[in-house]
Amino acid sequence: MATSMIQRLFKQGTKIVGVGLNYASHAKELGNALPKDPIVFLKPTSSYLENGGTIEIPHPLDSLHHEVELAVVIGQKARDVPERLAMNYIGGYALALDMTARELQVSAMASGLPCTLAKGQDTFTPISSVLPKAMVLDPNNLELWLKVDDETRQKGWTKDMIFKVPYLISYISSVMTLFKGDVILTGTPEGIGPVKIGQKITAGITGLSEVQFDVGRRLKPLLR
């Protein structure tokens, strides 16, 4: 079932909606103030990478930053959804990584430009198989973790999210229509950091899901 759901997600989903700075600890480590409203950005579905794949670092970058996140998979068309009804629009959950080319992000932000190149490249959204909704009793009480090789880098709980899952669905659907197969990346806890070519990322939702990805070089250089 999980395999068919992930394939359906790849084929049906129209967008990936990222949420930035949704953990106070992460905002603090970046030196940012806590957001008053969700910080929303888009990633293309072409950035998906299935479990076991290789995350590609584009030339001439030496590293990418890892950000482990709970992914919410939308189960039906959602527009202007009240927060109290938001959970009815969830089709499932997954573990995802929001891989970020931090050098490109910092440069873009300094120039007032969008961060699409920093977050939207091929393989920049590694994702697990989809967990059916019934398997996740409370999405706001899950432990996320990530290791690089054998070193634990990130460990946090979704209960520490500033904006919880129902509010995110309500807020985002008031701005843009969400379709079946769309994914919301709900933010990352503290501990982000660089991963380099030749390293291996292992990440999971404790008791529910685990993924593993190699890190390699994208052969074709980023055009300048």
Curated annotation (Swiss-Prot):
> What does the entry comment about cofactor binding?
Requires a divalent metal cation for activity. Binds copper in vitro.
Its EC number(s): 5.3.2.2
Entry-linked SUPFAM superfamilies: FAH
Reactions accelerated catalytically: oxaloacetate = enol-oxaloacetate
Q: Which GO terms describe its molecular function?
A: acylpyruvate hydrolase activity; copper ion binding; oxaloacetate tautomerase activity
Q: Where is the transit peptide?
A: 1-30
Any one annotated GO CC term = cytosol
Q: Which cofactor does it need?
A: Mg(2+); Mn(2+)
Which UniProt keyword terms apply here? Answer: Isomerase, Magnesium, Metal-binding, Mitochondrion, Transit peptide
Residues that, per the record, bind Mg(2+): E67, E69, D98
Where is the protein situated, by its record's location annotation?
Mitochondrion
InterPro entries hit by this protein: Fumarylacetoacetase-like_C, Fumarylacetoacetase_C_sf
Principal place where this protein is found?
A: mitochondrion
Q: Is Metal-binding among this UniProt entry's keywords?
A: yes
Q: What are the disulfide bonds? A: none
Transmembrane regions listed in the UniProt entry: none
Q: Which domain of life is it from?
A: Eukaryota
Q: Which family does it belong to?
A: Belongs to the FAH family.
How is this protein named in the record? Oxaloacetate tautomerase FAHD2, mitochondrial
- Which organism encodes this protein? Arabidopsis thaliana (Mouse-ear cress)
State the organism's lineage.
Eukaryota, Viridiplantae, Streptophyta, Embryophyta, Tracheophyta
